[in-house]
Amino acid sequence: MKLTLHEARVIGCLLEKEVTTPEQYPLSLNSLTLACNQKSSREPVLSMTETETQMAVDSLMKRRQVTDQSGFGSRVVKYKHRFCNTEFSDLQLSPAQYALVCLLLLRGPQTPGELRTRSNRLHHFEDVAAVERTLLTLAQADPAIVHQLAREPGRRDSCYEELISEQSKGVSAPILKQSAPAQQSDNSPHTSDEMEKLSARVTLLEKEVVMLKEALHELLN
């Protein structure tokens, strides 16, 4: 089952804050909501209420993706992810993979160049090639975690997206490819007429060739 938009945002924020602000991690409901609604480094920008954040957290807790933690003597409940890299997680990611998955959850489809530029606080990539190699390992995972999208007109590089949330477009690619046969079927009468005309023309040309051969034979004899 894929993550909803709100669930994906919660997981992405917990992944991000665990690395960028470890002193504030785990996050309270208020801090998590603020992180989800950041206007920078988020796409799309959301306006989640604490109730909506709590609903996403509750759903993730039922799926064992998030757990709550409260300090001794503290009345504030805080949350941390169990999405990856814990003893309870099936998914184990390298620091490079972790950074890219986090960015894709928070900002949607991005090119390798964009991912390298935006990953500085999470992980240092030597160059774009290093990003591409990491993306390849994620794409070849079983099941695949990321997917390369077709290059958009006017863009030099293709974007990659995560396949963890419902926002991913990877599932729509086969549907787009299937539209080609339908278009061909719509044009089939026109194609059939052209084939008939072409066949008649070939037959006529063949007759003319036979006549020319006969005329040439008479001249030579």
Curated annotation (Swiss-Prot):
* Superkingdom of origin organism: Bacteria
Q: What's this protein's family per the entry? A: Belongs to the UPF0502 family.
Compositional bias of type Polar residues: which residue ranges?
180-190
Q: Fetch the SUPFAM superfamilies from UniProt.
A: Winged helix' DNA-binding domain
Please give the residue ranges the record annotates as the region Disordered. 174-197
The molecule here is called UPF0502 protein Ssed_2611
